[in-house]
Amino acid sequence: MKENYQLQAGDELCFYIRDEFFETPPSEQAFLTVTPKLNIVYEDENILLVNKPAGLVVHDDESNTPNTLIAQIQSYLYQKGEYLPERENTFAPALCNRIDRNTEGIVIAAKNAQTLRIMNQKIKDREIRKSYLCLAFGRFSKASGEARAYLRKDENKKQVTVCDTPLTGGRTIVTRYQVLGYKDGVSLVEVDLVTGRTHQIRAHLAHLGHPLVGDGKYGKNADNKRAGRTYQALCAYQVEFRFTTDGGILSYLDGRTFRVRDVAFARQFGYDFTKK
């Protein structure tokens, strides 16, 4: 057939497509099936800070959904040409921290192995400060404070127990908070985690008598229904880099703060973000 031939009625065309085209990508390349929809807070050649929406899991879980935050990040970097799995045998872009499916906010991703090692160590050494905004039921007796307790994780129930006295298998938790406002039976609270345990904010504030609005696991469904929320009003809205040791290739981040500029539930509450 000549290249300038025009198809005519009755012509038959045969296409030869490799079988691999119809195969499901292997799990390590599942990101190829995902369309990235990222809200990027900050990005450079080493790290990526993404504002994860509530409802999106950070990693693959028992639901086996391919659409995870890390898959979206890998897909995004693949499309940019910054991640080429066929050339990279030992490293794939990875998350440095994680938050619950129904918690929104900043998650840090490393673009290279050296960044991942440094970030993991900085997080372990508490040289990276993460602050949260949340809505909690009730009026706090103090405008600010530091609460200490003990937390034990139940792997079977996938929830935690908090107690004021030591628990067998429990770990110490320390939660700092500042009340930013109160109205209609709800407080807007900024929380800093001195320790970072599973469900710490949700379980600790509930233990103090102030469950998060929308939290079905540690709150009351009747209250959540009246509030009109189906997931907890909790956002990891700010990250501060406060290095006390050498930051290596990430030293330029020392002293910098990144935050989500618009948290819907806080804005609807009436909080003025220009104050921050």
Task: Describe the role of every protein-language-model region.
Residues 137, 191-194:
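A structural micro-motif recognizing beta-strand termini
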Residues 129-133, 146, 172-174, 186-188, ...:
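Intrinsic-disorder/low-complexity, polar/charged segments enriched in Ser/Thr/Lys/Arg/Asp/Glu/Gln
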Residues 98-101, 169, 181-183:
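A short beta-turn/loop motif at secondary-structure boundaries
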Residues 2-6, 190, 231:
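Short, surface-exposed secondary-structure edge patches
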Residues 19, 36-38, 167-174, 184, ...:
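Pseudouridine synthases involved in rRNA/tRNA modification
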Residues 1-155, 265-269:
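RNA pseudouridine synthases
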Residues 78, 141-142, 156, 181-185, ...:
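Short, conserved beta-turn/loop elements at beta-strand boundaries and strand-helix junctions
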Residues 177:
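Long C-terminal interaction/binding lobes of large macromolecular proteins
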